[in-house]
UniProtKB/Swiss-Prot annotation:
Keyword terms of this UniProt record: Ribonucleoprotein, Ribosomal protein, RNA-binding, rRNA-binding
GO process terms (BP): translation
Source species of the chain: Alkalilimnicola ehrlichii (strain ATCC BAA-1101 / DSM 17681 / MLHE-1)
Biological role stated in the UniProt entry: Binds together with bS18 to 16S ribosomal RNA.
Matches recorded under SUPFAM superfamilies: Ribosomal protein S6 (SSF54995)
Pfam families in UniProt: Ribosomal_S6
NCBIfam families: S6
Full protein name: Small ribosomal subunit protein bS6
Entry's family note: Belongs to the bacterial ribosomal protein bS6 family.
Gene responsible for this protein: rpsF
Amino acid sequence: MRHYEIVFMVHPDQSEQVPSMIERYTGIVESNGGKVHRLEDWGRRQLAYPINKLIKAHYVLMNVECGKDELDELESLFRFNDAVIRNMVLGRDEAVTEPSPLARSQEKDEEEGGRTAEA
């Protein structure tokens, strides 16, 4: 099995569907012995440029270990799901488990926000 980093963006009007989409995609990966090493829901974020006249999208990052068949199934689900406006799959040499820079900055902001609220 190989390691992959997957980022997909969901239409902002479909944000309530994201948890069920994540559950479905992780189920596909884990169905034949694959693993999800990292899963981050980045939430609704500003796009760098408009896509289909949208300026925001709901981002999800997954680092997975799976076979080619599971990856093909995921890519076809992304392609035929109208709620997914963009997706990117990158091959990785090894599993990535540490938090992404975006997740680290969000954790740092939350910690600083908690400290100022206590003061």
